[in-house]
Amino acid sequence: MLIRFGLHLDGLDPTPPSTVLGEVTLGPQGLIGVLETNLGLPPVLDHPAERLMAYRSCLDEANDLTRFYHRSFQVDPINVAGTLLDWRARWYEAGWTGTFPSDGTDVAPRLRDMADVEILAKDRVPLTIGQRLQRIAADLGSRRTQIQKVILLDDPAELPAAWRAVLDQFEVEVAPGVSPTPNAAPGTDLHTIQTVLADLAARPEGRQLDKTRLNADGSFFVLRAVSRDISARAIAETLRDTADPAATVVIAEADGIILDNAFERSAVPRCGFQHYSRFRAVSQVLKLCLALLWEPINPHVLLQFLIHPLGPVPSPIRRALAEAVASEPGIGGRAWRTAIEDLDIHHLSNQAKDLDIHQIRRDIGYWFESARFPVDAAPLEILTERAQRCANWLAARLNTATDPGEQAMFRAAYAQAEALMNALKGLADQGQDHIAKIELDRLLDEVTRVQSDPNTFAEAGRVRATSHPGTIAQAVSQVIWWDLPAHPAELSYPWSQAELAELSRNGVELPSIGAQLERRSRLWRRPILNARQRFILVVHDSDQGYHPLWTQLTSVFENWAEVRLDEALLSGSCEVLPHLDVTTVGVAVQPLPTPKRWWELPVELAFEARDLESYSSLSKLFFHPHEWALTYVARLRTGRSEDLPDGPLLYGSLAHRLFENFFTYHDSEHDSERGSEHASGKPSGKSSWRDLHATDVREWLDEHLPTLIAQEAALLLEPGRGIDRQQVSATLERALVQLLEHLRAAGIQRVRTEYREEQAYLDINIRGAIDLLLTDATGQEIVVDAKWGGERYRGEEIEANRHLQLATYAYMRKTATGANRWPYAAYFIITSGNLLAPDDSVFPDAVVHPQAVDEDIADLWSRGESTYRWRREQLDAGHIEVNVAETEPTARSTAPQDALENDRGPDRFDDFTRLTGWNSFS
């Protein structure tokens, strides 16, 4: 058997295809597998997490106050184990035997500790590459293999010691392209570059002061680009009509999947670049399942679990719960409870007829409402059980999957869940019964390592490809190095010079940093030196800097053939891209649409009146009709992952629910048929709010507010939000105390909260929830709307008689009661505790904003009705006004004299600005 071996050949192989029997190209894993099979040695098939946890147990057993890793291990044992496991693997591959001399020679403390741990690890931790090579080298002395010769694609002197010990026992021939001489035709730019680079490599102490000027003949060609997708498409078009695919090698060190996707779009066979990721949907399920166990609940993680494409809870259920969380971030609030109550067979019949509603409720209880634990300690038993439940779900999905790619994904995810369970059971076997969140997260990172995409594969007739430049060890007609990425300019060891010297004295042959840098440079130069006819280098502009090879080329050479791809395409001046022979097709520039003040629809497509409106929808219809159309007719909305309310919106919602719960709890006279039927569930009538003092309010808040925050405003429980939570809590306490003072001063006898009302309005109905519906001693009703902030703006509304929201609520109550007079209306500002009113006739301590116009709330409502008719006439005719920036009102924008003034500017909270056109500043 003839083996072609290279340290970087476990991935794609750029060597020409061969039909010779008994000849194979292998990388490290492949060669070790062949040798172990030939020698009858058992393979090492452990999961990486198994090795990690085994070594962690050794570190734990050897740990005491004197160990160098002691303090770090207490904080993050998984990360420490991973780091030291890497040290161990590198040492073994460099020739370590697992010990240091015990003849009284002083050993550095860290090396001594590593040797002490190794006494345990040798028998417990699965073998490293270096240990397997040492085992193979020992057996080769007494056993034979089928390998007759090894053609080495690396410099033998640069191989790690363990590899040299194995290869020294075979006939080895070094491939000619390992130390290449210039291969291009003399007189070409490529030959000049090869000659100069070879000369510089031969005398590294020398330095070329003057740049070598090239002739730009295209034999060495640089393609500059910003977009990787566009450059990949250009390379794909270049290769589409190539007569001999085997004459070209493509290098893509990273993101080769972009190149393969471009090949597929251009009908070029895929090379088989792999796309490795730990973020595939199925791989995230295990992490999300376990992330829900920590206290406090993380609403962002909860929403991710619910909107994730996959999960152990049926998708219709997750979607319904996601809606609840998006409105009230938390678990157990009103929206959450309502969503669960709505989960019945009739609700699900159209989407999931086979779902068992009782099992669904049990699953909801298990996954979302189980006990949660502090981040410093969760029971291993609970975590193992949850991982097992996740594994059972993955196994069920695997058994029903029919697509091979999907099966591979679920199989890999199931293996990850099994690996986690084994790791957790291993910790339990060591006597540990709890694990901290940071340690579990590290462990999850290990078991859910990057996963390849089973749907990426090489196709027949492809060009040769590789992900490492060092694998090109023979002359090639054309080399294309796509995406020369930034690399760290410096390398370093985590060990001191004294420790390195001691390791060297004990047979651990670690190359110097200088030797590593020189070897890296030689590997980078190898593709250029092995190119015979043309070398194409694709360089992308990046904020991360440039590849050291690019830095060297730009410092030594000038005037090569170069095209800036993005500029060439955007200018439209190149019908054929120079040196690539790629024909470009001109595309007319399509400017982005600019904002228009009016959208025009055919009359037959005009919007009919909706049966039901609210103040919110009417406000959009009156002042920003395009928002009304897109929100309520087109039903567009922002994505749920971006839709968790926060800031004043969240705090205001929390305050509304708090007021509702408070008055329901403390007043037996609340309306049991309307606004308060969904209150906290606490028995009312404990004591009247009229008799409460500030200390009573504080005690009630101390008991009830933390639960409410966890249920409906859990964002305030996230790390870093402690100050926000304290400020919001203090604001709510102050506001509630001051609200009670206002109510007592006004002689309020009855308080109804979140009072739902629906009444006829012109030819439709109007619906709303009144924050506070009050009744004083005379029987007069007062509607109060609570706002988190905006005191100045709300005061100006009252002064100008533009408080349309209060007018809406007052109209509904006037209509419902048949009263002759309109209810009194006021705003309560939560952040200041002030009550804003047009006079102090009801609330003696109100901040008075006398109306500056000779109109009252009835006149305001009449103007609103005229505005509604005006806007409906426009919509019926297909006219939709778009009140956005960079548009000016037209004559059609002027409202009738008896309507509300249409003087509002663009809505700064408009969700649809990108759908209404692009202005010059976009």
Segment roles from a protein language model:
Residues 292-295, 308, 482-490, 529-533, ...:
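Short, well-ordered loop/turn and helix-capping segments at boundaries between secondary-structure elements
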Residues 155-158, 227, 252-257, 275-276, ...:
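An acidic- and aromatic-residue-enriched active-site/binding cleft used to recognize and process polar
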Residues 550-606, 872, 876-879, 884:
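Extended, acidic-biased charged interface segments
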Residues 1-506, 647, 651, 665-667, ...:
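Nucleic acid-machinery interaction/catalytic patches
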Residues 511-564, 867-897:
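C-terminal accessory regions
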Residues 536, 592-922:
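RecB-family 4Fe-4S metal-dependent nuclease core
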Residues 165-169, 261-268, 493-499, 545-557, ...:
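Short secondary-structure boundary/capping segments
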Residues 191-204, 556-563, 841-856:
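Acidic, Ser/Thr-rich peripheral helices and adjacent loops at domain boundaries
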